[in-house]
Amino acid sequence: MKLSEIADNVGSRKKRMRIGRGIGSGKGKTGGRGGKGQTARSGVRIKGFEGGQMPLHRRLPKRGFNNIFALEFAEVNLDRLQEAVDSKAIDAGKVVDAAALVEAGVLRRAKDGVRLLGRGELTAKLNIEVHGATKSAIAAVEKAGGSVKILAPKAEEGEAA
């Protein structure tokens, strides 16, 4: 037996069917695409169409809604604040508010307000003004000798403030 004499078992590799090669081949004329029309052409994909079967997006029930009045807060953790103080981006002597956080590069933008979260350690004494804070965050700031003032959420434009 030589390497050049090795062959596959009979029927283990089936040749692919070449379509559109005459009606005698059994896959000629329309080439398995049915009649004429949009789906007989190349590049056709009807999004969500599953061959007449009820598509998934219609089988599943509708659920929930989007509240147009929901407020979206930018979130800041204590460890991120401590990093900013350590790198001198935030002055510990001044009031830390949304504008100061954006200016320091801690936040990209303040959205509808800022919410303080309690992840990490805070050793700097900071006076913080935010629109929301967790109990653990408030406790950590006060333990470090600082204070947290909770502001009212930003009023909607056109609303009397």
From Swiss-Prot:
One of its GO terms (biological process) is translation. Transmembrane segments: none annotated. Residues 21-37 have a biased composition (Gly residues). The keyword Methyltransferase does not apply. InterPro entries: Ribosomal_uL15 (IPR030878), Ribosomal_uL15/eL18 (IPR021131), Ribosomal_uL15/eL18_sf (IPR036227), Ribosomal_uL15_bac-type (IPR005749), Ribosomal_uL15_CS (IPR001196). GO terms for cellular component: cytosolic large ribosomal subunit. Residues 1-43 are annotated as: Disordered. GO terms for molecular function: rRNA binding; structural constituent of ribosome. It comes from the Bacteria. Disulfide bonds: none annotated. Keywords: Ribonucleoprotein, Ribosomal protein, RNA-binding, rRNA-binding. Part of the 50S ribosomal subunit. Binds to the 23S rRNA. HAMAP family: Ribosomal_uL15 (MF_01341). Belongs to the universal ribosomal protein uL15 family. This is Large ribosomal subunit protein uL15.
